[in-house]
Amino acid sequence: MKIESTTGIFCIVKRNFIQFIAINNKKGGCDLEATSTILSELEEYLKQTDLTITQFAKRSQLHSGTLSNIINGHRPIAMQQLDRITRAMGLEEGFFYDLYITNYIIEGSTDWRRVGPLLLRCAELDKLDSIRRLARHVMDNLMYAPLLFDTAEELFNAGKMEAAAAIYEIVAETERFQHSERLALCHYRLFTISLSDDQDRNLWVANRFEPFVERLDEIDQLDALKELANTYRSLQRWDKVDECAAKMGHKARIQYELKVRPERRMSESTKLPGRPLFFYIAYSDLLRGNVCDELGDYEEALGYKYSYSDLSWVREQGDEVEHWRNLFHEWSIANIYITKLLSGDITVLESYVGYIDKHRNELVMGLLHILRAANKNKLNVDRTLELYQQEIEEILNNLVKGSYSRNLAMDRQANLIYELAYYYLYKEEFLKGFDLLLKTIINFQRINNEKYILESVTLFERYRSVASQEIQDQYHTLLLGGASHEEKDRYTSYGS
């Protein structure tokens, strides 16, 4: 018993030493792989624990003959076997994966029967460095590119986005001089994975992907252009929104004609887009109508909006078709109200408020449009703001706490608070206006929206002369170094 106890302690110390070496290896320290193999580690473990192959086979739930062949080098270790051996040695999952890559793939043979399962297992354990190392080695032989890409697709569909992105990046890097659909799909996936709350980064991500859209399958191009247009819309890049929307509408009309004309009907095996084809035509008009609103061309905006209010021409059928047809009709009603409000037609305000009451999920956008119209046309909308005071406070508190979904949602909410600040400052309700404006600056800093940070600064400077010294000090703190968590908490109550 005493000998077994001492041996056990020695093995624990040895395992800790191995882990220490492995950690330092990742940091640029000692190289475990240069002096060790999985088999040598296993043999040393058996020696120090005084276990026979039969005893360890029972502990690891492996057949003793199989284990003997592995130790004697007569057969390579399969992934499942390696995991069992690792557990039986009391080591953490995936401990030997880097050695496995060296021993059996880089120094052995690149057998996809080992590579594929190893990539998936590394993804399960979030071993991204191992994935990159393995993928780079595999891509030395371009014949593996389709298999590697398919693995990335499997991970993407399973929600393992970081692991998928690591593989997409390597496939794209290796095939960067190829004019292939696979390269374009890699960039498409990287685009969707990389979108975040950082607006500057989103612009870079969109610009990197856009040149690859035309290399995608014609059907994939529709969804890609839709997502690009939505990204540019969140970035207030209206020229790019219009460009992407126009391309999407043109391509969708071509595909729609191919589908509905019997003499040119697509085959049943043709790839289908994520939505019915008419959706992309109508959504193109919706986006272009929004662009016209932003540019102040309200007559043309109404033309686009009336065009998707009547979709009687649609010949596609099914529940999904009816779902989107009804939604576009509802959206057209609201968007026509918005255009008329922006043009100064206050008579539709009551009708638009009634629409918002029936569609509470549109509240943020609804209030944003009402405030933009009020600020542009110097309208008094106090009654409407009083009606939604509780909801506005909730939106404000969520922004201060950072409780939001994606960049587009936070962008809209931050814009709403900016318009509120503008509204109250113009009305000379300075305490409320400055409080909201400071919150606005914080949130535009969070999403790195330089355009609206500049607009917020411009608005503050316009009213600086009526700001208290305390407010000016808080303002300078935000601009010079950003607010600390404690300082941000000072701006938590609406109208304080």
Regions found by a protein language model. Give the residues of each.
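C-terminal non-catalytic interaction modules
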Residues: 25-51, 387-394, 417-496
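"A position-specific structural signal for the A-helix of alpha-solenoid helical repeats
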Residues: 117, 146, 150-154, 182-189, ...
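Helix-turn-helix repeat elements of alpha-solenoid scaffolds
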Residues: 120-131, 156-168, 194-208, 238-266, ...
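Short alpha-helical DNA-recognition segment
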Residues: 50-69
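Solenoid-like repeat scaffolds
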Residues: 62, 102-105, 123, 135-142, ...
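Residue at a conserved register position within TPR or TPR-like alpha-solenoid repeats
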Residues: 122, 155, 194, 228, ...
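DNA major-groove recognition helix of helix-turn-helix/homeodomain DNA-binding modules
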Residues: 80-95
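Alpha-helical scaffold segments of alpha-solenoid architecture
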Residues: 281-407, 411-417
